[in-house]
């Protein structure tokens, strides 16, 4: 290896890491109680969402949820790559993020906030309360249970990120709704 690893060397390291991750997942995670909890968290919230989501506003809710999901997955991937945190267990071995939270829990909870708190003021305060619950109650609990390890990250940073992510997502959806409304009235 020269001063910097070559693309081939980086590809080989990535291959070895993926192989090790799969071997660990098969030997340690798959079928464990923590794995089953994550499977349930990946599936069950969708039933809750289906029951409580206002189907008359499905397009806005789905757009909002997808935007939150994109933010969550992107930020989670970035934090993992920068070694800010680590997930010792996940539903699928190839994903280094907490799939159940990224694809289900956060988008669904935020979508329900968007639906039930329609004004900016009510949404903001509901978002602050939810961010506090996620950051200072749920995250420490999942650290204690071994689902999540903080490396160079804090619960306060999570708190701020949840709030910014929710506000940006709402702003984007409202911006699209305003554009649509302006262009639909002759």
How would you describe each model-predicted region?
Residues 1-186:
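Aromatic-rich, lipid-facing transmembrane alpha helices and their immediate juxtamembrane interface loops
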């Amino acid at each position: 290896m020269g001063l910097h690893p070559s693309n081939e060397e980086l590809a080989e390291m990535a291959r070895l890491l993926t192989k090790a991750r799969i071997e660990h997942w098969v030997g340690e995670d798959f079928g464990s109680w923590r794995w089953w909890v994550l499977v349930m968290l990946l599936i069950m919230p969708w039933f809750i969402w289906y029951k409580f989501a206002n189907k008359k506003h499905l397009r806005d809710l789905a757009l909002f949820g997808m935007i939150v999901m994109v933010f969550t997955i992107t930020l989670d991937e970035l934090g993992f790559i920068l070694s800010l945190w680590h997930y010792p267990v996940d539903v699928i071995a190839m994903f280094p993020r907490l799939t159940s939270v990224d694809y289900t829990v956060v988008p669904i909870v935020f979508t329900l906030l968007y639906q039930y708190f329609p004004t900016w003021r009510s949404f903001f305060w509901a978002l602050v309360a939810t961010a506090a619950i996620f950051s200072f109650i749920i995250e420490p609990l999942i650290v204690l249970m071994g689902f999540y390890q903080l490396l160079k990250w804090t619960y306060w940073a999570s708190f701020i990120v949840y709030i910014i992510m929710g506000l940006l997502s709402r702003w984007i959806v409202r911006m699209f709704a305003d554009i649509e409304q302006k262009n639909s009235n002759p």
